[in-house]
């Protein structure tokens, strides 16, 4: 704090990640035939980042505040485990005869499990670096009742990078090539809070985020992929509208908010 006009801040963040996903995909062709594919995935790891920021009051007797901040990428070290099981029920070849010498027309059940084939999970250890974040904000208060805020944030998602456990990117050429489909994202946040009485406030906000994907982006799965779940949507801009109320007492506080989201 310099003369109550310039404020500097620094934060070191530590993150723990524990993510699990199970997917079941099934096709039924009628007559008893069909197949299903099950996948199990798990990611564990930890990461860290550093945030630097400053708030400036350019005019001594004005409530105007200008904020700047820079967030380093989050540097993750992650362990990825996955396995899959494929089951199918199909009619046996009619040219195959059964034990009494007549053509077999029974449905046969077949299954393969990567855990059994590989004697364990498929395991990958890697490092992930997220984008840098740049932030500019403005704040202003009108009297003792109204507070206004505006914020702009930018992240370039095409700078995301995967590396192997030794820190080399060569073994992750496929994963890193997917970042060519990503682009910089701008986020704008606007907000207002009005205190009806000192303990009770009304709030409203708007949030706009441009698309993370390029217009011609698509999910490029390798031919040997075992992932079948739908987890990709090439959406364009995203808008959030919020309304809220808040109560602050000496022994109790409560907040309630409503959010409406639209995207293209």
Predicted regions and their residues:
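Outer-membrane beta-barrel porins/channels
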Residues: 1-264
């Amino acid at each position: 704090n310099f003369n109550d006009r310039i404020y500097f801040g620094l934060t070191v963040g530590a993150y723990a990640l524990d993510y699990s996903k199970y997917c079941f995909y099934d096709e039924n062709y009628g007559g008893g035939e069909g197949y299903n594919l099950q996948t199990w995935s798990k990611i564990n790891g930890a990461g860290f980042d550093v945030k630097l920021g400053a708030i400036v009051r350019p005019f001594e007797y004005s409530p105007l505040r200008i904020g700047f901040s820079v967030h380093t990428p989050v540097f993750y070290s992650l362990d990825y485990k996955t396995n899959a099981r494929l089951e199918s029920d199909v009619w046996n070849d009619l040219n195959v005869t059964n034990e009494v010498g007549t053509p077999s027309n029974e449905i046969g059940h077949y299954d393969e499990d990567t855990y059994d084939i590989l004697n364990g999970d498929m395991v990958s250890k890697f490092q992930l670096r997220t984008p840098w974040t740049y932030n500019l904000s403005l704040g202003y208060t009108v009297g003792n009742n109204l507070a206004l805020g505006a914020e702009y944030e930018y992240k370039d998602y095409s700078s995301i990078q995967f590396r192997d456990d030794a820190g080399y990117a060569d073994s992750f050429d496929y994963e890193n090539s997917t970042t060519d489909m990503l682009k910089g994202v701008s986020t704008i946040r606007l907000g207002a809070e009005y205190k009806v009485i000192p303990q009770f406030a009304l709030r409203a906000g708007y949030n706009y985020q441009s698309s993370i994907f390029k217009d011609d982006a698509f999910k490029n799965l390798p031919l040997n992929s075992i992932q079948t779940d739908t987890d990709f949507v090439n959406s364009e801009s995203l808008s959030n509208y919020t309304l809220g109320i808040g109560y602050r007492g000496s022994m109790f506080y409560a907040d309630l908010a409503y959010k409406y989201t639209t995207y293209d």
